[in-house]
């Protein structure tokens, strides 16, 4: 489920954009647990899209619990910054922030990108760190590890099913994808998810959409 699962347009302006979110949009999902249980009943598994870059802000359902886990005061309402190089933050990121949603029925995570390519440690890319730890965390309790992530460059297929990122709605974009996908197999990248039909810009074209679905199948 893409960003619609969490609050986007209604995030108070003092907190910035709605890209990052960890609280269900109850206007669209009034009973998340029942919704996820019904998907499971139908034999489906659910992944939620996350853009972790803005950390945990005071409007989030888990803000107080994350603040307490980090020994901070929730009353000040200060944002808890995303920091993939901070062990304590990453522990709270998984054990509090994500575990609450997994306990409701979320099966795995769709890690998206807003974090940039740099962290406090030179040469450490946040998306690589997220891929590594999401993969390991998903394998706890002897489960088969599973994570779904935006492409982080050659070699990143060590961990996730790859999401190739935003694609333009055009014939040129569709023409590129088969070659791109086939060439990826040359370096062992065998699991891909593309935006079938395109994601942005371009034009609406029913023939294009049909051919894109045909390619995806």
Predicted regions span which residues?
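Catalytic-domain carbohydrate-binding cleft regions of carbohydrate-active enzymes
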Residues: 1-217
């Amino acid at each position: 489920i893409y960003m619609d699962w969490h609050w986007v347009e209604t995030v108070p302006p003092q907190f910035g954009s709605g890209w990052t979110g960890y609280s269900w949009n109850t206007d669209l999902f009034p009973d998340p647990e029942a919704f996820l249980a019904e998907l499971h009943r139908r034999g489906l598994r659910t992944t939620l899209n996350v853009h972790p870059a803005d950390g945990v802000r005071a409007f989030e359902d888990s803000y107080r619990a994350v603040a307490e886990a980090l020994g901070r005061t929730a009353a000040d309402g200060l944002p808890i910054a995303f920091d993939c190089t901070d062990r304590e933050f990453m522990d709270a990121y998984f054990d509090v922030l994500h575990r609450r949603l997994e306990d409701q029925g979320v099966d795995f995570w769709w890690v998206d990108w807003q974090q940039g390519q740099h962290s406090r440690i030179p040469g450490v890319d946040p998306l690589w760190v997220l891929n590594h730890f999401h993969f390991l965390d998903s394998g706890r309790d002897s489960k088969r590890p599973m994570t779904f992530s935006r492409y982080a460059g050659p070699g990143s297929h060590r961990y996730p099913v790859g999401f190739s990122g935003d694609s333009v709605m055009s014939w040129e974009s569709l023409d590129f994808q088969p070659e791109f996908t086939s060439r990826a197999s040359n370096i062992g990248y065998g699991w891909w998810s593309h935006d079938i039909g395109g994601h942005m810009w371009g034009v609406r074209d029913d023939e294009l959409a049909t051919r894109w679905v045909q390619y995806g199948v």
